[in-house]
């Protein structure tokens, strides 16, 4: 049954909708006298409402404010579990989320180290792969099978290379999150962007990573520093860069000539002097931590790599260089430098902007 609204009754002599009328004939509500007690109560309520609004905007307590700024994350967490041809894996995280770069180190060792440093695997959201060589992917499927909440982030070409090169179940595709170079994606609280690096793997990638004001760059396994790699590495506050070999040691070593040529090619690995000269050229006070990674077991030593980089930085005017320790003296240095161990964990390293 249709419902109808009753038409209002129009009284004779009252103005119509479009008629002009003298509003001075009507008395406003503001013109009526107000009892002093009512007026006082209204003033009290207005004052209380004003105080409540100010408390919402400026109070540091638990009161919610729609204009309250998000908390600033002033430090990040970093652990390297191993870096070199025997296996590569590293962790970046904040207080609530994190991820792994590569999965070439035994899963049990990685998980034990994370737990020892108070990091729950539930907060480790995924694995970002740099390329498909075995020292970077050997344990990736083991992680995914045990921790079903995790995903593997790599380009489709890198995933195809991984399946082609290694005896890994096709079910890894169920955990694959496809990424594309120069297109940002997120893992937890981090934004990552993969960029092209020169190496002889399949669709090799470096990573430019941000979390608030923190800028991280990972550039491992690259034979030369391309324009895109240079573009992103200059943005870094924390830089993981390869220093694979000492050129005289490689030349005098026992490797066959074809392998020496492969290592020293533009699609191979970086030697200490190239890395050192490059770091001296791009250094600014914004660069807080330098991690030398993927040192060769046969053609390099940590001391040789560190000395090459330290000498280049000092020639560029950097007089104080810390060692990534928590000692007050080391923390006062404008830049921290460390050669990542080949087989061991670094322990938890705190990354600070100040």
Locate the predicted segments by residue.
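Metallo-beta-lactamase
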Residues: 50, 56-62, 156-206, 210-213
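Active-site metal-binding motif and surrounding structural segment of the metallo-beta-lactamase
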Residues: 107-154
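Conserved beta-strand hairpin/beta-sheet module of binuclear metal-dependent hydrolase folds
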Residues: 4-6, 11, 18, 23-41, ...
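Cap/insert and terminal regions of metallo-dependent hydrolase folds
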Residues: 3, 227-339
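Active-site neighborhood of phospho(di)ester-bond hydrolases with catalytic His/Asp-centered motifs
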Residues: 100-104, 124-133, 153-156, 217-221, ...
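C-terminal regulatory/interaction regions
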Residues: 2-55, 60, 303-354
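Active-site environment of divalent metal-dependent phosphoester hydrolases
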Residues: 133-137, 160-161, 202, 225-227, ...
């Amino acid at each position: 049954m249709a419902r109808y609204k009753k038409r209002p009754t129009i009284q004779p002599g009252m103005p119509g909708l479009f008629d002009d009328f003298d509003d001075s004939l009507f008395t406003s509500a503001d013109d009526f006298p107000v009892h002093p007690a009512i007026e006082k109560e209204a003033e009290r309520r207005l004052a209380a409402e004003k105080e409540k609004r100010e408390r919402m905007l400026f109070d540091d307590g638990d009161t919610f404010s729609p204009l309250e700024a998000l908390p600033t994350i002033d430090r990040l967490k970093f652990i390297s579990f191993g870096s070199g041809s025997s296996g590569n894996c590293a962790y970046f995280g904040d207080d609530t989320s994190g991820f792994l770069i590569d999965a070439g180190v035994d899963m049990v060792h990685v998980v034990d180290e994370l737990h020892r440093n108070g990091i729950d695997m539930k907060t480790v959201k995924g694995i970002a792969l740099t390329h498909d060589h075995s020292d970077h992917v050997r344990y990736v499927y083991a992680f995914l099978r045990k921790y079903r909440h995790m995903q593997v982030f790599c380009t489709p070409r890198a995933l195809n290379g991984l399946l082609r090169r290694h005896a890994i179940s096709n079910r890894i595709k169920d955990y694959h999150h496809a990424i594309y170079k120069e297109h940002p994606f997120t893992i937890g609280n981090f934004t990552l962007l993969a960029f092209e690096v020169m190496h002889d793997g399949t669709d090799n990638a470096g990573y430019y990573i941000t979390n608030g004001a923190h800028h991280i760059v990972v550039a491992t396994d690259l034979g030369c520093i391309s324009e895109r790699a240079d573009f992103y590495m200059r943005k870094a506050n924390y830089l993981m860069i390869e220093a694979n070999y000492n050129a005289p040691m490689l030349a005098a070593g026992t490797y066959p000539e074809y392998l020496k040529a492969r290592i020293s090619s533009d699609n191979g690995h970086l030697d200490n002097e190239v890395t050192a000269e490059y770091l001296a050229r791009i250094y600014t006070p914004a660069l807080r931590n330098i991690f030398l990674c993927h040192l060769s077991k046969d053609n390099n030593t940590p001391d040789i790599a560190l000395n090459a980089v330290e000498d280049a930085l000092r020639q560029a005017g950097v007089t104080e260089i810390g060692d990534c320790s928590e000692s007050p003296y080391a923390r006062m240095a404008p830049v921290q430098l460390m050669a990542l161990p080949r087989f061991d964990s670094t322990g938890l390293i705190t990354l600070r902007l100040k």
